[in-house]
Structures are given as C-alpha cells and as structure tokens.
Amino acid sequence: MPTWTEHIFYKKTGRIPSPGDVVEVAPDLVGFHDLTGYHVLEVLEHMGKVEVFDNEKVVVAFDHLSPPPNQRAAEIMVYIRRHVKSLGLPHFFDVGGGILHQIILERYAMPGQVIFTADSHGNTAGAVGAFAHGMGATDIAAALKLGKTWLVVPAPFKVEVRGEFPPGVMGKDVALHLLGQFGAEGFNGYSVEVFVERPKVFPMDDRATVGNMSTEMGADALMFIPDAVTAEYLKTARGVDYTPPSLEPGNYADKYTVELGRLEPLVAAPHSVDNVKTVREVEGVEVDQVFIGSCTNGRLRDIATAARILKGRRVKTRCIAIPASYEVFKTAMKLGYIDVLTEAGCVVTYGTCGPCLGGHFGVAGPGEVHLTTSNRNFKGRVGHPEAKIYLANPAVAAATAAEGRIADPRPYLKH
C-alpha cells in the first residue's frame, strides 16, 4: 500500500514517483503575505502580464508588517492591495485578519491537498494532512501564473506517537524533542508522516505546532495522517464532512516513535533550535520579555493554557500575547481569556508576526533575554543580535511571565 505522501503524489501525477524524482504538481492552494507578496508580484510583473491561474485558489494575508510600522511597509501594502483588487482575489485578509498560516489552516486546508506558500512555515497545514510546502518568491510566482510548479519527491519518514501528554507538555515539546533527537535539518529530503495511536489525546492546535516547526527540522513537509480529530476539526471549524482514510502500512525510508508520557517541558536555548534542554536545566534564568503567540503557538489551546496559569496573577516581566487570527482572538475574548491576560498585565493584540521576526511590537534590545513560543532563536531573530532567545511552549511561557524567570509550569497545573 502507498504511504500518504505517495497517495498525494499519485493523485497529482497519475503515478507513484520514487524519492528524488522531479515532478510537476498543480497546487490546490497558493498563499503569500505582505513581506513576500511584494517580491512575488514583482516577479509576475517581470514575467509579463500579472495574472493568476485561479483566483479562488489564492490566499493573501497582511501579517508580518501589520499594521505597517513604517512608511516603506505602508507602501508595500498599498502596492499589494492594488494588485489584489485588479486580480479580483476574494481570499484577502487585510490588517487584523491574522497570520497567513493560521488562516489557511482554519479556513481552507484539506487532507490530501498540495499547498504552496511564499513562506517557510506554510507547512502548518500539515496538521490536517495537507502536503504544505514553502517556496521562494520566484517559484510561487510561477505557480500562480502557470498553475503548476516542480518538486523533488521526498522520501516518506514515519513517526508514531504513543501515550498521552503529561501536565505541562504540549505539541511544542514534541517538536523540540524531534529537534533534539535529529537536529536542525535532520529531516532534509523527507516527508514526515505522523500516526497518532490515540488521536483524541493530540488536539489539532498541537498538531499545527509540530507541522509548523518541521521547517526547523528541514522536512519538505510534515503531515498528520487524517483521523477522528481531523474529521471533528473540519466539521466544527467549517461544517465539512470528512471520512478519514483506512491506511495499510506503507514502505518508509525510516521510522521513529515518540512516547508522550516520557516527555517533559522542553526549552531550546540560545542560539539554535536543536540546543534542546529540559525546563529544569534552565530554570531560574531571568527573562526581560515573554512572547506568547505566533503561527507556532497562537492558537486557542495555547491562549487558554496561558490564561489558566496567569489567572489571578500579575506578570513580573514584560509579556506580549498575540492570538494568531481574528477567529482565535474572537473566541478567546468570548471565553474570557483576553480579560485574564490583560488583567495579568500582558499586552494583547490581534494576529501579527511582529515580535517573531523582530519587526515591531516587541523587538529585543541588546543583552536582553526573551522567552518566546515562536519557532526560531538564532542571533538577531527577534531584534538585536546580542539578545538571547529561548523557545518554549505556552505553559512554560506563562509560568515564566508569572515569575520573571524561566519556570517549570507543572506546579501551576496541579489544580
């Protein structure tokens, strides 16, 4: 029987290609945002007439420079809006709509689709079993104009997930565990297929975190094999009926098993995503700012976890919390999570990538220590190159904000 990766490529090419084959693939969806969209549209202009193969299959979101923090950013947005209008693109999310990857996940992505984005973290949509792959501006422009582009077929790698999350452990810790085991770029040339033994214990929001950080692992894609959680998510979020496939074991290049019960809260210490330590090893490090959000950890379960820990407390360091989309913000507000966070002293705003890329709304200064739920911690990622960046899950982030130093969240979750 074919693997899920082979199944997807068979649907697109009419054959099961071998790893390393170069194939042409027609995407089901193409996405870009303000930071990359300018370059994508410039390439289209150089190719002649600015046109897209199917305006219903294009998603555009303003998230990186949103709202525009300077004149140049405002000029870029004016330029993109003009093209969005002239092309008649209906799936456009202006300032306040949210982060592109979250929007695609909650509104559009379906199991078995092929999705290309002009951003490396488009693989977030792998949470629902889509082959989601980031590309540069030139390749995205070609895909938009021609309705197809080339891919090197990756080798399938199977990850089995067993057990259930202990208190204080989340999807971020699965991602950090894999990074610690295989290293940054350890999955180069692979399409990672994740099978969850007990689907209900691994929520969709946590799956999205793992898919998102597969970029840091070097994976071409990471897909959770569709199951009951996938079907429930699609029904609840969009009213779509979906029946998960019954897959027989396929032939994989390699396999690995994650035992959730053996994990504990993990932290990626400066200055590499694979410099992974347990929270106990870095506990007590004083922190200047905490960021809870991003396309990695700005979903409802992330915000709810932070609110649970911070309820009735005041933060002892700067704390910025950003839900990843308007839908997440709206739901978090209805459930009271936004009130809890603001009363705790957090600065809360709508979906923007600002702090994650060191662009605005919380840039790191020289010598500062930042703990963030985002996905990268190399020098200069969140601002000044002399800043130190730690990556962790939202529970660790909230506990750290409560204490002003890196803290184990488990004592906060005992009752």
UniProtKB/Swiss-Prot annotation:
EC number: 4.2.1.33
Binding site for [4Fe-4S] cluster: C295, C353, C356
Pfam families: Aconitase
Domain of life of the organism encoding this protein: Archaea
Keywords in alphabetical order: 4Fe-4S, Amino-acid biosynthesis, Branched-chain amino acid biosynthesis, Iron, Iron-sulfur, Leucine biosynthesis, Lyase, Metal-binding
One GO process term, biological-process aspect: L-leucine biosynthetic process
Keyword Cytoplasm: no
Cofactor binding, note field: Binds 1 [4Fe-4S] cluster per subunit.
Catalytic activity: (2R,3S)-3-isopropylmalate = (2S)-2-isopropylmalate
Known role: Catalyzes the isomerization between 2-isopropylmalate and 3-isopropylmalate, via the formation of 2-isopropylmaleate.
Stated family: Belongs to the aconitase/IPM isomerase family. LeuC type 2 subfamily.
Oligomeric form and interacting partners: Heterodimer of LeuC and LeuD.
Name of the molecule in the record: 3-isopropylmalate dehydratase large subunit
Organism, as annotated: Pyrobaculum arsenaticum (strain DSM 13514 / JCM 11321 / PZ6)
